[in-house]
Amino acid sequence: MDNSGKEAEAMALLAEAERKVKNSQSFFSGLFGGSSKIEEACEIYARAANMFKMAKNWSAAGSAFCQAAHVHLQLQSKHDAATCFVDAGNAFKKADPQEAINCLMRAIEIYTDMGRFTIAAKHHISIAEIYETELVDIEKAIAHYEQSADYYKGEESNSSANKCLLKVAGYAAQLEQYQKAIDIYEQVGTNAMDSPLLKYSAKDYFFKAALCHFCIDMLNAKLAVQKYEELFPAFSDSRECKRIKKLLEAHEEQNVDSYTEAVKEYDSISRLDQWLTTMLLRIKKTIQGDEEDLR
């Protein structure tokens, strides 16, 4: 069956579902099994939505899932309603990102009302990702990652909470909200230090915190590095610590060439990602006579 045939079938199913909902509201249906008609309508709306998905009509699929969700709410089937709102959100992601967010928020309201905070956290991440990639609203992405982290923390899912917080820190630093980023990197780094599995990554978080300090002020960064060495002696011997000290030295001497050389050395061992490149360039711009290139 081609897409137009699938759409026609989906439209017929929608009409059937709507008839059942309408009939269930009549007086006699109320006496004789109105709720069973509504249950059937839910099922038919979902079938229509899946048929629209097969036809790649994502908006129509999303709308049909939403209708199913509203009917589930009439039946007090909260969990089924939330599932349908999530299905609607996933369909709308491909056609209308803002509507996808609206549907996911409806699902989150239901899940939090039911005390299902881990699932709510997961959907806040989905919303954050839509703001990151589709709507490019980083402030809103940050807000949803923070909310997700709060819910994960409340459920003692600290590893998942930290992943969200690290996203917040990365974006906060890009938006020049350095203190916010520092607080998170230090908090996650301190927690990682105490874990045999995670302590290797602590040096990376302290390195990033030091770079954020460096973007504020060189003396800030120097004091921060000393603090991290005392707090986590393994940091002193790390490549990250040696690198930040070389960068500090070059900056103190206002030597652009030494600074660039230190960055090149670091890049030759572990490639610079976009975030590190941005931070290192911002610091380099504070050296007199720089020509705004790291290589």
From Swiss-Prot:
Subcellular location: Cell membrane
Key words, A-Z: Acetylation, Cell membrane, ER-Golgi transport, Membrane, Phosphoprotein, Protein transport, Transport
Gene Ontology CC annotation, any one: synapse
InterPro entries noted in UniProt: NSF_attach, TPR-like_helical_dom_sf
GO molecular function: soluble NSF attachment protein activity; syntaxin binding
Main location: membrane
Phosphoserine found at: 26, 29, 195
Post-translational modification N-acetylmethionine, affected residues: 1
Statement: the UniProt record of this protein carries the keyword Acetylation: yes
Tissue localization of expression: Widely expressed. Highest expression in brain.
Membrane disposition: Peripheral membrane protein
Domain of life from the UniProt record: Eukaryota
An individual GO BP term: synaptic transmission, glutamatergic
Family indicated by similarity: Belongs to the SNAP family.
Assembly mode: Interacts with PRKCABP, and disrupts the interaction between GRIA2 and PRKCABP, leading to the internalization of GRIA2. Found in a complex with VAMP8. Component of a SNARE-like complex that contains at least ZW10, USE1L, RINT1, STX18 and NAPA/SNAP-alpha. Interacts with VTI1A. Interacts with STX12. Interacts with GNA12 (via N-terminus); the interaction promotes CDH5 localization to plasma membrane.
Function, in words: Required for vesicular transport between the endoplasmic reticulum and the Golgi apparatus. Together with GNA12 promotes CDH5 localization to plasma membrane.
Protein name per the record: Alpha-soluble NSF attachment protein
Organism of provenance: Bos taurus (Bovine)
Gene from which this protein is expressed: NAPA
